[in-house]
């Protein structure tokens, strides 16, 4: 299993309860597919570097996970489908 850093931006209009449910759902997608979540950071609402779908802000989440490729691929697939996630990126961390 490799280490990955996942960052995703949630649409700012999402209610707080729905936002928590979304974060739990995507954490569940990872853990149900064999990933281990090492660290979760909520950066909160921040201004975007450029407009995405006429939005200027987004709620940032960062996850550090130890995972196999299947869990990452499933997260990526579902994040692309979900309209509440504006952008996401998965970065493989270098092994030391």
Swiss-Prot record:
The UniProt record lists the keyword RNA-binding: yes
Bilayer-spanning residue ranges: none
One GO cellular component term: ribonucleoprotein complex
GO molecular function, one term: small ribosomal subunit rRNA binding
Family annotation (InterPro entries): Ribosomal_bS6, Ribosomal_bS6_CS, Ribosomal_bS6_sf, Ribosomal_S6_plastid/chlpt, Transl_elong_EF1B/ribsomal_bS6
One GO-annotated biological process of the protein: translation
Gene3D superfamilies linked to this entry: 3.30.70.60
Keywords, alphabetical: Ribonucleoprotein, Ribosomal protein, RNA-binding, rRNA-binding
Superkingdom of origin organism: Bacteria
Stated role: Binds together with bS18 to 16S ribosomal RNA.
Family in the record: Belongs to the bacterial ribosomal protein bS6 family.
Protein name per the record: Small ribosomal subunit protein bS6
Organism of provenance: Bacillus cereus (strain ATCC 14579 / DSM 31 / CCUG 7414 / JCM 2152 / NBRC 15305 / NCIMB 9373 / NCTC 2599 / NRRL B-3711)
Gene it is expressed from: rpsF
């Amino acid at each position: 299993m490799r280490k990955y850093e996942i960052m995703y931006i949630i649409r700012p209009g999402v209610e707080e309860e729905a936002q928590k449910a979304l974060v739990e759902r995507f954490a569940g997608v990872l853990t149900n597919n064999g990933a281990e979540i090492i660290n979760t950071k909520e950066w909160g609402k921040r201004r975007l570097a450029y407009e995405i779908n006429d939005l200027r802000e987004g709620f940032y989440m960062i996850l550090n996970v130890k995972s196999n490729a299947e869990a990452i691929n499933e997260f990526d697939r579902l994040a692309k489908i979900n309209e509440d996630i504006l952008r996401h990126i998965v970065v493989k961390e270098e092994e030391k």
